[in-house]
Regions:
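Multi-pass alpha-helical transmembrane bundles in non-GPCR membrane proteins
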Residues: 3-160
Length: 160
């Protein structure tokens, strides 16, 4: 039976090490991204398994499934602009995240309606914004709220 009197060792819990670890991980990610070659898009990427049409809308189920992103983003934005999150220092990051969720629904819906490399950009671009704003939220919630707030825009710009 383990001794519950002693705290479990956690390297990121040691006072003063969180920020250096975060900077090291970030530096490794940036260096890796700069050194690796671009990933080519396979030619068959746009061939969906389910290509059924309904009401004249091609790939109907792929297109309409994006309504969930629009709905979730709308509910999230209502919470940000309502009383749920409005007083939080990270509310701009939450606003960008939920706004990006709406844009994911729109961009991905357009891509699945007309799948090609040009519309794929509008599928992926809002995802990059959402991922980076989510990273700022995680940094703010678990490391330091002010750092997360200040990193929002640099992270979003880095992501796009």
């Amino acid at each position: 039976m383990p001794n519950t009197d002693e705290p479990e060792f956690c390297p990121t819990c040691i006072e003063g090490i969180r920020i250096p670890v975060l900077l090291l991980v970030t530096a490794c990610g940036i260096i890796s991204a700069l050194l690796l070659p671009p990933i080519a898009q396979p030619s068959g990427y746009h061939d969906f398994a389910d290509q059924r049409s309904l009401f004249g809308i091609p790939n109907i189920w792929d297109v309409t499934s994006n309504l969930a992103f629009i709905l979730a983003g709308g509910i999230g934005l209502a919470g940000v602009f309502g009383k749920v999150v409005s007083r939080c220092a990270l509310s701009p990051a939450y606003g960008v995240f939920f706004g990006a969720a709406i844009l994911i629904g729109l961009g991905s819906g357009w891509y699945h309606l007309e799948p090609n490399n040009e519309t794929l950009v509008w599928d992926r671009l809002p995802m990059a914004v959402a991922f980076m704003s989510f990273l700022a939220i995680i940094i703010g919630e678990y490391i330091d709220m002010n750092i997360g707030r200040r990193l929002l825009m640099p992270l979003v710009l880095l992501g796009v």
